[in-house]
Amino acid sequence: MSLPFSQDERDLAAGGILTIDLAALRHNYSAIATRIAPTRTAAVVKADAYGLGASRVAPAFYEAGCRDFFVAHLGEAVALKPFLKPDATLYVLNGLQPGTQAACAREGILPVLNSLEQVENWAALATRLGKKLPALLQFDTGMSRLGLSAKEFDRLLENVTLLSRIDIKFAISHLANGDEPGNAANARQLAKMTALLARLPKLPAALANSGGTFLGKTYYFDLARPGIALYGIDPERQHDFSDKVAHENKKPKHSILPVLTLSARVIQVRDVDKGATVGYGGTYVANGPMRIATIAVGYADGLFRSLSNKGAAFFGDTRLPIIGRVSMDSITLDVTSLPEGTLKLGSLVELIGPHQRLEDVARDCDTIPYEILTALGNRYARVYVYVNGGGTSTTA
């Protein structure tokens, strides 16, 4: 009889290690919640908590005081519910597909109603059940993505019976440019939201996303729902990629801590001669004798092919450029600058960490941190830790 594959063996067999700091996540939530109080602060944990594991991340936010959790799909909410205590509330941002209303009500999950059709479907269920059903009502104030249009809102207000069947907990909208403080679209959306609320007196409201929590008190209303800021990304800095030096020297204005590190294992080190080609298509040609190392992660693990010949890893303070094309399961590094024998089979190199932030990797990929974060695959060994005062306590 064979022995079971232990957790230690699984971790050693993985191509890389993704370490998630639950203490930093709690800090980021508390920092935002404290700054915008008495506005309630929710946590957006859609897409498996931005790829970091909602079943571990959401309870960390709960421990920090969060009681409101937003996901995108009903299935996400149902899967997460067992990991939260009964006084937590789950909201479904995308609303409900036909035929799922009864399940949503049965589970005690609140839908965000984004169209008159969704409102009508939810009200019809309330009529069948003989009771008002709670929900959030979203308005489109300028993003043209989700929410009732102005015409739908007018029709809704005319239908007193329809409104009477729903217990509207919040009227919400979403900022399209909240991460750009100087963008005039923010003020326009705020004005539209304020005008809508004037027609729904005393109804609690929510507008601010991560960026919105840094725009000032007029954007806070009664509930804010930060997402990316909770996961260690300053929303005002994430697009500042035009000048790498300026980006690296720009000091964060907000007490947001990084929450993850990513390292990858070396699977081979070799010496190559001048003229040797590296990777698919031979896009890199050695300009002299050099030492290269192959690591066991690739674009299947969220390290996009656009990193080919321009990204990097780190070993200590030494930058190790990516050479050749990124493959599905492997990446090749120029490690000539390291003393011979420094790297060997199983050695770990840093991909995201103190020497290279998530934003830096996103910049090298010509994308945004959200895309990298949510693309980090399930092949990594995931380690959840609490880092306190320089000490580390491993939880999984």
UniProtKB/Swiss-Prot annotation:
GO terms for biological process: D-alanine biosynthetic process. Its EC number is 5.1.1.1. Pathway: Amino-acid biosynthesis; D-alanine biosynthesis; D-alanine from L-alanine: step 1/1. The modification N6-(pyridoxal phosphate)lysine is found at residue 46. GO terms for cellular component: cytosol. GO terms for molecular function: alanine racemase activity; pyridoxal phosphate binding. PROSITE patterns: ALANINE_RACEMASE (PS00395). Substrate binds at residues 145, 328. Its cofactor is pyridoxal 5'-phosphate. It catalyses: L-alanine = D-alanine. InterPro entries: Ala_racemase, Ala_racemase/Decarboxylase_C, Ala_racemase_C, Ala_racemase_N, Ala_racemase_pyridoxalP-BS, PLP-binding_barrel. It comes from the Bacteria. Gene3D superfamilies: Alanine racemase, Lyase, Ornithine Decarboxylase, Chain A, domain 1. It holds the Pfam family Ala_racemase_N. The active site is at 46 (proton acceptor), 280 (proton acceptor). It is an enzyme of class 5 (isomerase). The keyword Aminoacyl-tRNA synthetase does not apply. Catalyzes the interconversion of L-alanine and D-alanine. May also act on other amino acids. Belongs to the alanine racemase family. This is Alanine racemase. It comes from Brucella suis (strain ATCC 23445 / NCTC 10510).
